[in-house]
Structure formats: structure tokens, C-alpha cells
């Protein structure tokens, strides 16, 4: 596993040995004092100690926001070499070697801890990247499909609701027209019924008048019948009287004939009696014919009047029956029209109630869909904000990862440097004032602004600010 420095708070043994703190952070200049492992040669070999001081600074640049590391060698000091005839202080070298081994052991432990922390950090970064990818896919899915589908469903349902409203409006208009037509028919039938009632009343009045006339005609007929009976009785009485007179005349004629026979000298009375008889018979026949003619004329007049009255009565009765049938038919038709009107009014009320309930349901559905759309837009905006935050965190983590990668590469290159033998340690220590005067860090702040409206990205702007620390 690679070894790297990842914390600026740890206490290194470099402070005890070299007096400096090899600490670094993302926002401050990073320095890593590197020194080679000391080694002792033979007496005839020359040894030298080289101390190199590097300054590693992170410079953020470019559109991607990734930092680059720049390492510069501050200086190097080389210890004077000793010849073969010079003596070495082994006690000093031994002490330095022991302290160096202790320092390396502490560094290994610290690097192990840093490696564990770095592995945890990488796992966390991977987890955040997975969450970021899932959220990005969710945002893309919501942005690309759901709003348009919801809008299509909303428009389709609105079109269906409008079509149903138009159908119901047309049905209501048609029912209103039918109701108006039925009301007109009902008014016309009522007017016709009133006319028929008036005609019935007139017919009843005429019938009452006809009944009075019939009664008068009946009384007149009865009177005439009584008169006819009286006349018949009178005619019979006159016949009897006439017969009596004839018998008396015949008797008188017989007596006169006897007297004539007895008295031939008397004038002939037979011719006179015959003349008188013929005269009386003529008068009687004339009276009888006149009476019969008067009786027949009176009877015919009464019969004609009775027939006329009977015809009028029969016609009145027939008209009354027809009027009764018409009144019954009109009454049945009015009852049927009333039932039809009641059923149509009931259907119209039911249609109005159903239309009102469906309209309220459609309004509730519209409000619910609008609320769902607002909720989806708010959720989309929240996902976009989270996505933007995760994107910013990812960019910052990418910068830190790049920095750690550079640090790890630098540390590996430092560890893999060839170890030279040395006889004495001589290093160059730079003061904080000198390091401060030589170290410059360039800090780049990238501000990314995303404007959303109703859950959709309207504009996106990126701004970079450079600061030199």
C-alpha cells in the first residue's frame, strides 16, 4: 500500500529531529522535508550527507478545478567528505542512527494510520460518487420523462374533461329546447282544453235550451194529441148527431112519404129531401175533410217539429259524446305530457346534479394534479440543489484526491530515492521567515450558479476567482 501524508494536525518526529513541522493542508502551502537514509562506509570510502528541502504547493487552475502540485527545491547542503585517514565519531553516528530508526518506525505507524484514513476516505468518496450518480440519473429521469408525461396526462385529462363538459352542455341545451317545446305544447294544449271546455259549456247550454224546446214541443204534442182526441170525439159526436139527424130526416121523409102517398095532392118532397141530404152530406164531407186536413197538417207539423227536435237532440247528444271523448283523450294526453314533463324535469335535475358533481370532481382532480405537479417541481428543484451540492462536493473531493495523489507520488518518489551512506549529518534548516518569503500559493475559487424555474434549469454560469496567498 502506498504511504502518504493526509493530515495537517499530526505530530511528526521531524519536529523533534529537525525542528520543523512537516504539516500541510489543502488551503496552505505544503512542505515535505526529505532526507536520505544515513549509512556508514569503510575507512577508505568517502561519505557525504545531502539535505534537500522541497516545497510543495497546490495551484488550482483550469476549468476543471483540479489542482496541480509544484515542487521546488529550496536548497541543498552537502556535508564535507572525510578522507580515509580521518576518524569518525561512531558514538554520534550511533545515536543519530538510533534516533533515525525510531523516527522511521514512528513514520511507518503514522503512514499506516494515514493509509487507513485515506482508504476510509476513498470508500466514502466512492459511496458519495455512487449516490451522486444515482441522484443524477434520478434528476435526468425526472427532467427528461416525468414532467412531460405528467403534462401530457394533464393535457389529455383536461381535453377529456372539456369534451365531457361540451357534451353535457349540448345535452343540457337539447334538454332545455325539448323542455321549451314541451312547455309550448302544454300551453297550446291548455289553450285548446280551455276552448274545448268553453265549447262543452256552450253545448251543455244549447242542450239545456234544446231540452226546454223539446219539453215545450212535447207539451205542444201532448196538447195537440189531446186536441186531436177532443176533435175525434167531437167528430164522432157530430157523426152521431148527423146520423141521428139523418135518421130523423129519414123518419121524417118516411112519414112525409107516407103522407105523400096518402095525399097525392101534396107536393113531391123526396127530391127536396134528397137535395137536402146531398147538401148535408156535402157539408158533412167537407167538414170532415177540412177537419182531417187540419188534423193531418197539425200532426205533420208536430211530427216535423218533433223529428227536428229529435234530430237536434240526437246531434247534441252525439256532439256531447264526441266532446266527452275529446275531453277524455285530451285529459289523458295532458296527463301523459305532465308525466313526460315531470320525467324530463327530473332527468334535467339529475343531469344538473351529476354535472355539478362531475365538475366538482374534475376540479378536485385538476387541483390534485396541479398539487402533484408543484410537488414534483419542488422535488425536482430539491434534487437539483442536492445534485449541485454534491457536484460541488465532488469537485472539492476531486481536488483533494488530486492533491493526495500528488502527495503520495511525491512521498513514494522520496522513499524510493537511493540511500547513500554518510558519516555525518549536516542539513540546512530554513527559517519560517525564509519559507514564508519563498512560498507562494495560488488559490482558485470556482463559483457555479444554476438558476432553476419550476424544476427546470434555466441558466448556468461559472465564475472563477484567483487569490495568491
Curated annotation (Swiss-Prot):
Residues 268-286 are annotated as: Coil 2A. The keyword Isomerase does not apply. Residues 295-411 are annotated as: Coil 2B. It holds the Pfam family Filament. Residues 108-140 are annotated as: Coil 1A. Keywords: ADP-ribosylation, Cell membrane, Coiled coil, Cytoplasm, Intermediate filament, Membrane, Methylation, Muscle protein, Nucleus, Phosphoprotein, Ubl conjugation. This is Desmin.
Amino acid at each position: 500500500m502506498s504511504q502518504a501524508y493526509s493530515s495537517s494536525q499530526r505530530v511528526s518526529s521531524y519536529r523533534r529531529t529537525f525542528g520543523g513541522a512537516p504539516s500541510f493542508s489543502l488551503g496552505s502551502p505544503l512542505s515535505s522535508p526529505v532526507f536520505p537514509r544515513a549509512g556508514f562506509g569503510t575507512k577508505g570510502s568517502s561519505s557525504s550527507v545531502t539535505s534537500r528541502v522541497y516545497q510543495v504547493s497546490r495551484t488550482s487552475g483550469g476549468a476543471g478545478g483540479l489542482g496541480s502540485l509544484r515542487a521546488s527545491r529550496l536548497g541543498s547542503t552537502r556535508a564535507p567528505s572525510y578522507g580515509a585517514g580521518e576518524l569518525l565519531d561512531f558514538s554520534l553516528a550511533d545515536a543519530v542512527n538510533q534516533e533515525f530508526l525510531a523516527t522511521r518506525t514512528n513514520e511507518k505507524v503514522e503512514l499506516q494510520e494515514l493509509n487507513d484514513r485515506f482508504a476510509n476516505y476513498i470508500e466514502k468518496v466512492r459511496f458519495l460518487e455512487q449516490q451522486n450518480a444515482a441522484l443524477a440519473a434520478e434528476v435526468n429521469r425526472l427532467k427528461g420523462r416525468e414532467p412531460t408525461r405528467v403534462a401530457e396526462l394533464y393535457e389529455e385529462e383536461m381535453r377529456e374533461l372539456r369534451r365531457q363538459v361540451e357534451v353535457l352542455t349540448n345535452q343540457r341545451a337539447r334538454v332545455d329546447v325539448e323542455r321549451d317545446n314541451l312547455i309550448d305544447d302544454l300551453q297550446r294544449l291548455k289553450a285548446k282544453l280551455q276552448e274545448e271546455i268553453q265549447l262543452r259549456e256552450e253545448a251543455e247550454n244549447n242542450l239545456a235550451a234544446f231540452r226546454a224546446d223539446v219539453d215545450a214541443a212535447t207539451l205542444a204534442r201532448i196538447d195537440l194529441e189531446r186536441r186531436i182526441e177532443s176533435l175525434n170525439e167531437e167528430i164522432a159526436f157530430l157523426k152521431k148527431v148527423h146520423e141521428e139527424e139523418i135518421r130523423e130526416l129519414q123518419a121524417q121523409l118516411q112519414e112525409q112519404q107516407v103522407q105523400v102517398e096518402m095525399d097525392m095532392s101534396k107536393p113531391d118532397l123526396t127530391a127536396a129531401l134528397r137535395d137536402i141530404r146531398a147538401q148535408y152530406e156535402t157539408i158533412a164531407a167537407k167538414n170532415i175533410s177540412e177537419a182531417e186536413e187540419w188534423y193531418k197538417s197539425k200532426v205533420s207539423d208536430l211530427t216535423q217539429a218533433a223529428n227536428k227536435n229529435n234530430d237536434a237532440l240526437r246531434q247534441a247528444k252525439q256532439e256531447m259524446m264526441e266532446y266527452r271523448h275529446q275531453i277524455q283523450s285530451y285529459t289523458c294526453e295532458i296527463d301523459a305530457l305532465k308525466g313526460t314533463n315531470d320525467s324530463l324535469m327530473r332527468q334535467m335535475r339529475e343531469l344538473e346534479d351529476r354535472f355539478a358533481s362531475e365538475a366538482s370532481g374534475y376540479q378536485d382532480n385538476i387541483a390534485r394534479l396541479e398539487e402533484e405537479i408543484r410537488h414534483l417541481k419542488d422535488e425536482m428543484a430539491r434534487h437539483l440543489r442536492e445534485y449541485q451540492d454534491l457536484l460541488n462536493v465532488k469537485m472539492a473531493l476531486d481536488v483533494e484526491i488530486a492533491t493526495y495523489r500528488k502527495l503520495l507520488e511525491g512521498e513514494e518518489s522520496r522513499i524510493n530515492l537511493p540511500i547513500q551512506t554518510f558519516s555525518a549529518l549536516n542539513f540546512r534548516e530554513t527559517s519560517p521567515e525564509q519559507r514564508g518569503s519563498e512560498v507562494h500559493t495560488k488559490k482558485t475559487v470556482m463559483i457555479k450558479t444554476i438558476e432553476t424555474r419550476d424544476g427546470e434549469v434555466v441558466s448556468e454560469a461559472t465564475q472563477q476567482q484567483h487569490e495568491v496567498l
